[in-house]
Design a protein with these regions (language model features):
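Gly/Ser/Thr-rich loops at beta-strand to alpha-helix junctions
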Residues: 54, 75-80, 103-105, 158-162
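Active-site phosphate-binding strand-loop segment of PLP-dependent enzymes
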Residues: 128-165
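Short, acidic/turn-prone active-site loops that include or flank metal/cofactor-
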Residues: 102-105, 122-128
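Conserved beta-loop-alpha segment that forms the PLP phosphate-binding cup at the N-terminus of a helix
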Residues: 69-94, 105-110
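Conserved N-terminal alpha-helix of the aminotransferase class I/II PLP-enzyme fold
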Residues: 34-79
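Substrate-binding/gating loop at the entrance of the active-site cleft, primarily
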Residues: 99-117
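N-terminal "arm"/small-domain region of PLP-dependent enzymes with the aminotransferase-like
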Residues: 1-52
Length: 165
């Protein structure tokens, strides 16, 4: 499988082109990775309007993952969590999301920004501040107590300690 982004960046770094673009270090080594640190320059594609090497790389990743489509994102999990919640609540009529207590902090800000009603799943037992073991029974009881199905159920699994929901 070809690696369009890595190949482009390697070629660009090796070209010793004068950089009149961001980032400000201009590719001069300080930590060692600067020659490969670029922005949306000609040929590098644009993440949110991918048509070139990023689109090709996403297509390759999708084939590797066996998914219909793969989209790269910035900001780690936070942006993806916000997008997921937005899509979940705009796809249906419910603004309720059921969530375990060990959620990512981006969930809290997304829930506030989207004005969601969060129904918390309480673990049957808690062995730590980070763990939140949720059983199938616990989830079924919570869902059956709701007047209507939620827009989504948000579980972190495996959790930060390796526990599975």
């Amino acid at each position: 499988m070809n690696t369009p982004i890595a190949d482009f960046v390697r070629r660009y770094a090796a070209s010793d082109a004068v950089r009149f673009h961001m980032p400000g270090h201009k590719g001069r080594p300080f930590l060692g990775c600067e020659p490969w640190d670029i922005t949306e320059i000609a040929g590098a594609d644009a993440l949110y309007e991918a048509e070139g090497i990023i689109a090709e790389s996403e297509k390759n990743a999708g084939a590797l993952f066996g998914s219909r489509r793969t989209c790269y994102a910035t900001e780690g999990a936070s942006q993806c969590i916000r997008a997921m919640l937005y899509l979940a609540v705009t796809a249906g009529k419910s603004r309720t999301v059921v969530a375990a207590r060990n959620i990512h902090r981006a969930f809290i800000s997304a829930a506030a920004l989207l004005d969601l009603e969060v129904v918390w799943l309480w673990p049957e037992e808690s062995r730590s501040l980070c763990g939140c073991p949720i059983s199938e029974k616990n989830l079924e009881q919570t869902l059956s107590a709701l007047p209507e199905p939620p827009a989504a159920v948000y579980l972190t699994s495996p959790d930060y300690l390796g526990g599975m929901a």
